[in-house]
Amino acid sequence: MDLPPQLSFGLYVAAFALGFPLNVLAIRGATAHARLRLTPSLVYALNLGCSDLLLTVSLPLKAVEALASGAWPLPASLCPVFAVAHFFPLYAGGGFLAALSAGRYLGAAFPLGYQAFRRPCYSWGVCAAIWALVLCHLGLVFGLEAPGGWLDHSNTSLGINTPVNGSPVCLEAWDPASAGPARFSLSLLLFFLPLAITAFCYVGCLRALARSGLTHRRKLRAAWVAGGALLTLLLCVGPYNASNVASFLYPNLGGSWRKLGLITGAWSVVLNPLVTGYLGRGPGLKTVCAARTQGGKSQK
């Protein structure tokens, strides 16, 4: 399934046009709420917004690259910079969504015990660990195994390959024999692990909702709030990481599905602000947490 270059260009441009204002508004809204009362959820939302804004800024260049059928339009030395700006948020976003889901689950399932550890300083530490983990893992994989890396033994610039047509390509002409295991390791640690955490927390939140005293309407809304993070992981970032697994299992699969996965991943900059903004506004799990906390106090 190979999309026409014009369609890929249009999808990247649309994601940028929608994602940039949405993420700016999300960051401004989270900052305004943080000035009144900083919570762990706001810390995760701020870091997710900054990560998505970095991805959004890289989308115009990705659109130009798609219109040129994958040819790299800038100097070769800028390919590593683009790789960090584009691929780092794709993986870091899953970590922030998993952290946000874990905080919501702990607040709903263990309201009394979680209150003792519900401090923003701990959340900042979690976010710093996510930034460091993703950056170090990406740096090791790209620096060692990418075209022009330490293990590649070629004279090209880092990340740059020149296929038979003579046009330089940034990362997308990577040798499948080395690209498959490298990308699979990234997906395994930085996507499937956060996905498993988010899914577990979603199920736990549903169980907490089933035992709560909320009305049916509020239960439905809270269930949607709890599932927002899981939804964006599956719909946006899931296809890209599925293509990484497929290319690892079948090295000769081709890059068509990867191109489609990169486009769906770009649209996470549109869905993520909607998910975090809705989580911040809705009564959902905050109401559950408050109700269960009050119930715990009344039992004493």
UniProtKB/Swiss-Prot annotation:
Effect in UniProt of substituting S123A: Reduces response to synthetic agonists
GO cellular component: plasma membrane
Outcome of substituting Y44F: Reduces response to synthetic agonists
Keywords: Cell membrane, Disulfide bond, G-protein coupled receptor, Glycoprotein, Lipid-binding, Membrane, Receptor, Transducer, Transmembrane, Transmembrane helix
Tissue: Detected in brain and pancreas. Detected in pancreatic beta cells.
Annotated S-S bridges: C79-C170
Cytoplasmic face of the membrane: 32-41, 102-121, 201-223, 280-300
Free-text function comment from the UniProt entry: G-protein coupled receptor for medium and long chain saturated and unsaturated fatty acids that plays an important role in glucose homeostasis. Fatty acid binding increases glucose-stimulated insulin secretion, and may also enhance the secretion of glucagon-like peptide 1 (GLP-1). May also play a role in bone homeostasis; receptor signaling activates pathways that inhibit osteoclast differentiation. Ligand binding leads to a conformation change that triggers signaling via G-proteins that activate phospholipase C, leading to an increase of the intracellular calcium concentration.
Family stated for the protein in its record: Belongs to the G-protein coupled receptor 1 family.
Protein name stated in the entry: Free fatty acid receptor 1
Organism: Homo sapiens (Human)
